Amino acid sequence: MTKTFRKDTERCQKRGYNMELLKTAIRLLEAQGSLPPSYRPHKLSGNYDSSWECHIKGDWLLIWEQNDSELTLLFTGTGTHSDLFG
């Protein structure tokens, strides 16, 4: 987890988001390396072309980097589209 991700999770907690939903998505990624289609996971492009994004609920997003050959995940952001992309 990055420092930014930790700050993002604190902001989401203050907003009253159900953090169990985020934890569930993270656990699924850790266990399976992917998410079900209901999360709408997809690869990003441009400045974020090494990252993936999914929808936790509505406009609440999770962004992460994934290296399948090394079996690593790096959670880099969570929040709304405007929080994360300006």
PLM feature spans:
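Acidic, metal-associated active-site segment
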Residues: 63-64
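Basic, Lys/Arg-enriched alpha-helical interface segments
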Residues: 1-58, 67-74, 78-86
